[in-house]
Regions:
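Short amphipathic alpha-helices and their capping/turn segments at secondary-structure boundaries
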Residues: 102-109, 160-174, 234-244, 287
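Distinct, well-ordered alpha-helical segments
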Residues: 132-140, 161-170, 194, 233
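Auxiliary Fe-S-binding modules of radical SAM enzymes
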Residues: 2-40, 71-72, 247, 254-334
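Conserved C-terminal portion of the radical SAM core fold
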Residues: 201-260, 276-299
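Acidic (Asp/Glu)-rich catalytic clusters
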Residues: 109-111, 139-146, 166-176, 208-212
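Core AdoMet radical
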Residues: 68-105, 109-132, 147-160, 176-202, ...
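Hydrophobic faces of well-ordered beta-strands that scaffold small-molecule active sites
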Residues: 39-41, 118-120, 151-153, 177-181, ...
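N-terminal [4Fe-4S]-dependent radical SAM core
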Residues: 2-59, 64-119
């Protein structure tokens, strides 16, 4: 639940009128009475159905997965898992990779922050796009690690099944289980334009089914998609809220090298969102969040040479600062 902040350095606003945005950190602190740290995991062999040709080829026009998942850059996959095989020949390697990544990150967080509780975040590519036995082995292994309170699983709605939901529902009886769906937009013409390979009806169907199992859902929204107006972005936000998602992540669309979007940008067919419009749209969204819905991310960026545009996405800390300041003017503390 959103609580009243007792600490605010603003001299021009009544402290008692400042509301705290329910960040994920605050959500976990309220529930577990101490901070919970996400440990991002990138398992080699996973891919996406719009990369391998199942629903499309080439992937989303904006996606160069390494750029969105830094953990993957040092762990280039040497094999690709066929999601339709009965037996996964790479499972032992994947389980070992999971263990090595988790404990390396856990130790770093313990040393730096004194971390005591963790949630394992299956981040890169589509983390339900694999044989069910593989998913069961990976998720069960992750939950067996000391001090792990749950899982967060990044995936697509077209890669969810009733059988996977059965398993996750069973896990959720004892653990905190989150499913993170890449919604991006509820406009089918936009989803077609970015080669998403999924449609709004299917997205809504599986979010609804996931919620019916009592599982937590985090929706990822991208602001600044091709030809989308602020009205369209806010409509996507409102539709996500209507689906009763538990949390949201906001991302600006930026152009990185080696993507289909790069070609559109260089031909003048795509104009990136301005920082001012992005900040304004995120602030308008957060202002209209119902109580109890958390915000896991307000922006994203990339600081290396692969970023082509917009250049304001190079400095994520600057973006967050501007969003914080804009929210504070609206009586909200992020």
């Amino acid at each position: 639940m959103v609580t009243i902040s007792l600490q605010n350095n603003s001299s021009f606003m009544d402290k008692n009128k400042i509301k705290e945005v329910l960040t994920m950190g605050r959500y976990f602190k309220n529930k577990f009475k101490e901070k919970v740290y996400k440990t991002p995991i990138s398992i080699s062999g996973f891919t996406c159905p719009n990369i391998d040709g199942t629903v499309a080829k080439g992937g989303c026009t904006f996606c160069e997965n390494d750029s969105f998942s830094p953990n993957l850059q040092e762990r280039k996959p040497s094999f690709k898992l066929n999601p339709r095989v009965e037996k996964n020949p790479f499972l032992d390697k994947q389980l070992k990779q999971l263990e090595m990544q988790f404990f390396a990150t856990k130790q770093r967080l313990e040393n730096k922050f004194g971390a005591k509780k963790f949630i394992v975040y299956f981040q890169s590519f589509t983390n339900t796009y694999a044989p069910l036995d593989t998913l069961k082995a990976l998720y069960t292994k992750a939950l067996s690690f000391d001090d792990v309170i749950g899982l967060s699983i990044g995936t697509r709605t077209d890669c969810m099944t009733d059988e996977i939901l059965d398993f996750l529902e069973d896990l959720s009886k004892d653990k905190e289980i989150w499913v993170e769906y890449g919604i991006q937009s509820f406009y089918d013409k936009t989803l077609d334009r970015i080669n998403r390979g999924d449609d709004s009806a299917n997205i809504k169907k599986w979010i609804t089914k996931t919620k019916q199992r009592g599982l937590k859902v985090c929706g990822h929204l991208i602001y600044g998609l091709p030809d989308e107006t602020q009205e369209m972005m806010l409509d996507t936000f409102n539709q996500a809220i209507d689906l009763k998602v538990d949390s949201l992540k906001f991302h600006p669309l930026y152009v990185v090298k080696n993507t289909l979007l790069t070609k559109e940008y260089k031909r003048g067919q795509f104009i990136p969102i301005t920082e001012q419009l992005y900040v304004d749209t995120v602030v308008k969204s957060i202002k209209n969040l119902p109580d109890g819905i958390s915000v896991q991310r307000v922006t994203a960026g990339i600081e290396d040479s692969t970023l082509l545009a917009p250049l304001w996405c190079k400095n994520k800390h600057s973006q967050i600062k501007k969003i914080r300041e804009a929210l504070l003017k609206e009586g909200l503390k992020y």
